[in-house]
Structure formats: C-alpha cells, structure tokens
C-alpha cells in the first residue's frame, strides 16, 4: 500500500519581533492614556472644593482687628496665612525668599470666599455639616499658581475653627500647606496677624 502524503495547513504567519514590539508599545500607550485620564479626573475632583480657575482677588489690610463669635445656627471659620522664613536661602535669591506678599485664594465647597495676602487673616460663617476647604496661590508664576492645598471637615453649630495656611520659601522650591489648628494656636495666630478685606477683581 502506497504511503499517504499528509499535508498540514499553516496555523498562521508568525509575527515578527518588530510587530510584537509595536503591539507592546500600543498597549503601553493605551495604559498611559487611561492612567492620565484617571489622574486628571481625580485632580478635577480634588479641586472641586476651590472656585473658578480664572478668578482673581485683590486684598487690602483693614485697620480693625475683628474677632467675632458664631452667629446663631452657624459655625465660624478663621483662615490665617502664616509666612515662614528660609534660613538656608542665599541672601540674593529674591525668587526664593519673596513670599512676604503671597496672595492666597480661599475656596469652600466650590466657591471662592475670600483671600489673604501676607501675614493676615479673615473669617466667614458656615452652615453645619461636612465641608471642603481649598487654598490656591494666586501668582503670575505658573509653578506657584499650581500650588493647591485642601482640607475637609465637619462643622458644628456654634463652633469656631481655625485653619492655618503656610507658605514657606525654599532655595529651589517651597512648602504650601493647610491644616486645622487648636483654638489656642488659632487665637494666637489671629492676634499676630492683620485683618484682610478682599474682593474679586472684575
């Protein structure tokens, strides 16, 4: 009996190494794009406590030193700007040390409520409940205008809350943060600062 010739059909063309590299690169690009989109969404959600991005404020010191108590049914929020020093900065580095007139916008639940400039403070009434506070450095320098700090808290009727925003210069960078301080520290910061009056620029 004559042998039967068996022919096998090719399973498919083998991919070249360049095609495999191209596919891997495409997967990485898609992954990076997805991660970037998620990062942007998370950033937008975090900044939702602030106000409109393009809003600008002007701040003037006030001769009075007002320290009111909460009105009925409300909490009272003090926000104090605390400027630090940079002992390690070179004396001639004006860029690093020039934060004494830093203007910071203060937002609450997506609305700008005021601003501080220099060692100053202001206050505002707030309904009880959970709230989200935001500060943003208003500056013509892009790196500084991207400085944000956030805090969330639950306000109680009749309570007074003191938030300290700190701007500390550095030789090549800076510290920009926001924290809730105890009432003793808060009262000291308010007593050591100038009351500021701010309004949105048209």
Q: Where are each of the predicted segments found?
A:
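Short loop/turn and low-complexity linker motifs enriched in small/turn-promoting residues
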Residues: 38-202
């Amino acid at each position: 009996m004559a042998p039967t010739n068996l022919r096998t059909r090719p399973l498919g063309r083998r991919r070249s190494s360049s095609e495999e590299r191209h596919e891997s690169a495409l997967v990485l690009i898609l992954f990076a794009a997805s991660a970037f989109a998620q990062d942007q969404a998370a950033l937008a959600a975090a900044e939702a406590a602030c106000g409109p991005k393009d809003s600008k404020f002007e701040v003037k010191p006030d001769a009075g030193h007002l320290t009111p108590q909460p009105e009925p049914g409300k909490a009272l929020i003090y926000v104090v700007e605390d400027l630090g020093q940079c002992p390690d900065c070179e004396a001639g580095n004006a860029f690093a040390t020039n934060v004494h007139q830093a203007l910071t916008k203060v937002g609450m639940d997506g609305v700008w409520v005021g601003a501080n400039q220099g060692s100053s403070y202001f206050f505002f009434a707030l309904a009880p409940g959970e709230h989200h506070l935001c500060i943003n450095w208003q500056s013509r320098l892009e790196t500084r205008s991207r400085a944000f700090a956030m805090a969330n808290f639950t306000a109680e009727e009749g309570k007074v809350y003191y938030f300290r925003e700190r701007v500390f210069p550095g030789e090549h960078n800076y510290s920009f943060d926001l924290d809730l301080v105890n009432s003793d520290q808060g009262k000291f910061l308010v007593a050591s600062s100038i009351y500021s009056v701010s309004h949105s620029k048209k």
